[in-house]
Amino acid sequence: MDFKEILYNVDNGVATLTLNRPEVSNGFNIPICEEILKAIDIAKKDDTVQILLINANGKVFSVGGDLVEMQRAVDADDVQSLVRIAELVNKISFALKRLPKPVVMSTDGAVAGAAANIAVAADFCIASDKTRFIQAFVNVGLAPDAGGLFLLTRAIGITRATQLAMTGEALNAEKALEYGIVYKVCEPEKLEKITDRVITRLKRGSVNSYKAIKEMVWQSSFAGWQEYEDLELELQKSLAFTNDFKEGVRAYTEKRRPKFTGK
């Protein structure tokens, strides 16, 4: 399959999915989300694939939602496309947790919004020491999507997850390592080498064991995902109709602080 928003290739048992919209800091729109889901499905069905690696082209891993497209949707009162993106990014996190193969993510620069939560959905996140994980939703009048709070509360605890979501503070790579979100931290120039080292180690393991482990983890911790997804989409849809969301997007594109009114 030919992709336009991502790159996908398989080499020696490793499927590499590369976000390839560096001109917009790898922002998520509907096409890239659909391509990511398709690539995950291809990797799932391909018996030659042992491991899925996700990385990105450009200086930024991903800013999360494409704010330029969000501005267009706000101006056109096109709430449905915004809801569709929220639905798709949740499905991406779900697909990664349900993929019966190890998922390795290699990050550098900003990992914001939905991208930050998709990173939590990975089994191994290797981050350069320049990486920043940002729950940016509150800055534009939204709440976390991509299964964010479902994943974060389980990964780092309820209090820390709530604080990150409510403040939108950037979490640096070392702190993310301390919290357990990140597996390894290294200098940017060593990121590829360290990622390869982790993948090499994983390739020595049994694919049958990995499949069983991921199913056990799912059943023990994530079986309530569907109910959470319904709630997440319902609340995100209600927030997308608010004046605060419109103000948040406009403030971002105009490079100023938003003035929220609670309406």
UniProtKB/Swiss-Prot annotation:
The keyword Lipid metabolism applies. It comes from the Bacteria. It holds the Pfam family ECH_1. Disruption phenotype: Mutants do not produce monounsaturated fatty acids, exhibit reduced glycolytic capability and altered glucose-PTS activity, and are extremely sensitive to low pH. Gene3D superfamilies: 2-enoyl-CoA Hydratase, Chain A, domain 1, Lyase 2-enoyl-coa Hydratase, Chain A, domain 2. One of its GO terms (molecular function) is trans-2-decenoyl-acyl-carrier-protein isomerase activity. GO terms for biological process: fatty acid biosynthetic process. Homotetramer. Belongs to the enoyl-CoA hydratase/isomerase family. This is Trans-2-decenoyl-[acyl-carrier-protein] isomerase. It comes from Streptococcus mutans serotype c (strain ATCC 700610 / UA159).
